[in-house]
C-alpha cells in the first residue's frame, strides 16, 4: 500500500464544509432521480454543482485510491450470496432466502442489516437455512461510514459486499430472488473474463453518463445502458480495488447521491474510475408489475426483482403496510404459490 498522503487543502475545505449545516441542505432526502431534484441552498445555487465541490470530490477520490490496501492472499474463500435487508425488508429477505433454497442453490448466505433491524428471534428464523447474520452498524462502529438518515440503506450494499467473508459474491437486494439456481453465474464466460457482472435498469436506453457527474467522480463520460443493482456478481479478489472504490463513493453519499440515483450507479462508476472492464447482461430487462424481470445471457428470466408490492406481514414488529398475505399474488410470476406458502409459514412462527 502506498504511503498515506495528507488530504489537499481543497479537500480539507470540502470535508470541513460537511460539518457545516448551512452548507448542504438535507431536507430533500427523497427517492427521485438526480435530474428531478431541485434542492438549493440559501443562495439558490445547487451546491453539488459548484466547481470547487466537484473538484474537491475528484481529488478526494484520487487521494483515496492511493490508500486502498492490498488484498491479503487467502483471506477470503469460496463463493456465497450476500443479501441486505432487515427491518421492514426482513420479510422480503426471508422469502428470497426460501426461494434460493427451493431452487436447489446450496451456496452459503450472509444477511447484512443495520442497528435495530433484527432481533434474536429473526436471526433464529433464518439461521437454519444456512444464513449468517451481520450487524453492519456494529461492524462499522468507530467509523463515519453510515449517514444518520435512510440513505444508509443504500450505503449498506457496498459495505456488505466488501466486508462479507466470501471471495466471490452474488449480491442481492432483499426483494430480488432467482427463479432457478443462479450458481452457474460464477462459471459464465463473461464473469470468468472480467470478474464482475452487472444488469441493466428497466426501460432504459443507452445514454451518456452526465458530464458534470463524471468529472466530479473522476471518470470519463461514457455511454451505456444504466445499471440496476438489485443483483450483481463480483469476484472480490480480482476486483478488490473496485469494491473499495464503490464503498468510497457510497461513503460520500452526502455528495454522490445528489448526482447519481443511490448506490446503483456507484458500482459501474467505480469500475470506470479504475479503468476496469465488467461483463453486462445486455438483454434489456422487462418491467412486469410489480417489478423487474432480469434475464440471463440467453434472454431467459433469472431474477424477479419485486421493486413494488413487496412481501410484508401486518401486525409484526417491522410491518409498514396494511397489505395482507395473499393479496399481492402475481399470476404471471414464477414461484408465487411457494412464496405465499413461505409467507404463511413465517406468519406462524414470527410474532
Write out the residue ranges for each language-model feature.
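A glycosyltransferase accessory/donor-loop signature
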Residues: 1-79, 83, 89, 221-351
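Short internal beta-strands
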Residues: 108-116, 198
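Active-site-proximal specificity loops/subdomain of glycosyltransferases
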Residues: 118-164
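Hydrophobic targeting segments
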Residues: 79-83, 100, 109-111
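GT-A fold catalytic core of metal-dependent nucleotide-sugar glycosyltransferases
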Residues: 135, 153-209, 232-233
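Conserved catalytic core of nucleotide-sugar-dependent glycosyltransferases
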Residues: 144-145, 188-245
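Histidine-anchored nucleotide/phosphate-binding helix
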Residues: 83, 87-104
Amino acid at each position: 500500500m502506498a504511503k498515506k498522503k495528507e488530504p489537499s487543502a481543497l479537500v480539507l475545505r470540502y470535508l470541513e464544509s460537511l460539518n457545516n449545516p448551512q452548507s448542504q441542505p438535507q431536507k430533500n432526502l427523497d427517492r427521485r432521480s438526480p435530474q428531478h431534484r431541485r434542492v438549493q441552498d440559501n443562495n439558490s445555487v445547487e451546491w453539488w454543482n459548484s466547481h470547487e465541490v466537484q473538484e474537491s470530490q475528484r481529488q478526494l477520490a484520487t487521494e483515496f485510491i492511493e490508500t486502498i490496501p492490498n488484498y491479503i492472499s487467502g483471506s477470503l474463500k469460496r463463493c456465497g450470496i450476500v443479501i441486505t435487508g432487515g427491518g421492514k425488508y426482513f420479510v422480503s429477505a426471508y422469502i428470497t432466502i426460501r426461494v434460493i433454497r427451493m431452487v436447489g442453490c446450496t451456496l452459503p448466505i450472509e444477511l447484512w442489516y443495520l442497528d435495530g433491524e433484527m432481533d434474536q428471534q429473526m436471526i433464529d428464523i433464518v439461521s437454519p437455512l444456512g444464513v449468517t447474520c451481520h450487524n453492519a452498524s456494529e461492524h462499522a462502529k468507530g467509523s463515519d461510514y453510515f449517514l444518520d438518515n435512510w440513505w444508509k440503506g443504500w450505503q449498506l450494499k457496498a459495505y456488505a459486499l466488501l466486508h462479507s467473508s466470501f471471495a466471490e459474491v452474488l449480491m442481492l437486494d432483499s426483494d430480488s430472488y432467482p427463479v432457478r439456481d443462479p450458481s452457474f453465474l460464477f462459471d459464465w464466460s463473461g464473469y470468468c473474463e472480467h470478474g464482475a457482472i452487472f444488469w441493466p435498469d428497466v426501460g432504459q436506453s443507452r445514454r451518456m453518463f452526465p458530464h458534470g457527474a463524471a468529472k466530479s467522480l473522476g471518470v470519463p463520460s461514457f455511454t451505456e445502458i444504466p445499471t440496476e443493482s438489485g443483483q450483481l456478481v463480483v469476484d472480490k479478489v480480482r476486483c478488490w480495488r473496485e469494491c473499495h472504490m464503490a464503498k468510497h463513493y457510497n461513503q460520500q453519499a452526502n455528495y454522490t447521491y445528489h448526482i447519481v440515483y443511490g448506490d446503483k450507479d456507484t458500482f459501474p462508476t467505480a469500475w470506470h474510475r479504475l479503468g476496469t472492464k465488467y461483463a453486462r447482461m445486455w438483454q434489456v430487462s422487462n418491467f412486469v408489475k410489480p417489478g423487474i424481470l432480469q434475464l440471463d445471457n440467453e434472454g431467459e428470466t433469472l431474477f424477479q426483482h419485486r421493486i413494488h408490492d413487496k412481501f410484508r406481514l401486518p401486525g409484526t414488529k417491522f410491518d409498514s403496510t396494511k397489505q395482507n398475505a395473499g393479496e399481492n399474488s402475481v399470476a404471471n410470476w414464477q414461484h408465487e404459490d411457494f412464496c405465499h406458502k413461505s409467507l404463511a409459514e413465517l406468519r406462524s412462527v414470527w410474532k
